[in-house]
Amino acid sequence: MKGIFGTKVGMTQVFEENGRLIPVTLVRVEPNQVVSVKTKEKDGYDAVQLGFNQTDEKNLNKPQLGHFKKANTNNYKYLEEVRGMVGYKIGDLLKVEELFQEGQVVDVQARTKGRGFTGAIKRWNFKIGSKGHGAGYPHRFQGSVQAGRGGSQAQRVMKGKKMSGHYGNELVTIQNLSIVGFLPEVSSVMISGAIPGANNSKVRITTSKKNPNTVLTYKLIINKKASKPAGEQAQE
């Protein structure tokens, strides 16, 4: 398995030569540096610890500073592990275009937007109650929780009952997305479809678990004029 980390920039769209529109999520992936290496002999599993998003010393505590000083690497805001990556040593810089290729199918993991304490209608898509008799607010209540029905049913609310509660802020993996293209001039990658989470949130890109060898073909329309500075466009 191969993996790398970045931050979500936002969504846009690109077009293929046949006119097909592809919605893509732009992920900024600066080079990740190997800060620590785990081995099966010493730690029981193979993995690399990657640092990304450089930060100042003032934003880190003493144990973190000591960890980076021992590895003789830059200071990073985030440290994350990727299991199954072997053959790397401390200090190596990993680039997304070197780990993956255009069209490769990948799995993307991110944390969804937190929505706080939410009612059952928004959280579980429950049906709203009838509004025909001016009942006030109870039309948004969740209704019966089916406790104490007698017989074989226990006299309590069953575990896992869909009710109001905390919604969002969950780690979600979206499988079988594909890399549409790379933008090395801005250290970014275009991934097909939507990725959970807010802009500037962490994103983990790994080899697809179900389709590790699948590579798709994209023939994108490249607007060369748009990629030039504004002054050069005006002269043309």
UniProtKB/Swiss-Prot annotation:
One Gene Ontology cellular component: cytosolic large ribosomal subunit
Molecular function as annotated in GO: rRNA binding; structural constituent of ribosome
Keywords, ordered alphabetically: Ribonucleoprotein, Ribosomal protein, RNA-binding, rRNA-binding
Keyword RNA-binding: yes
Top-rank lineage group of the source organism: Bacteria
GO terms classed as biological process: translation
Tagged with keyword Secreted: no
InterPro entries: Ribosomal_uL3, Ribosomal_uL3_bac/org-type, Ribosomal_uL3_CS, Transl_B-barrel_sf
Pfam families referenced in this protein's UniProt entry, alphabetically: Ribosomal_L3
Function: One of the primary rRNA binding proteins, it binds directly near the 3'-end of the 23S rRNA, where it nucleates assembly of the 50S subunit.
Family of this protein: Belongs to the universal ribosomal protein uL3 family.
Subunit composition and interactions: Part of the 50S ribosomal subunit. Forms a cluster with proteins L14 and L19.
Protein name: Large ribosomal subunit protein uL3
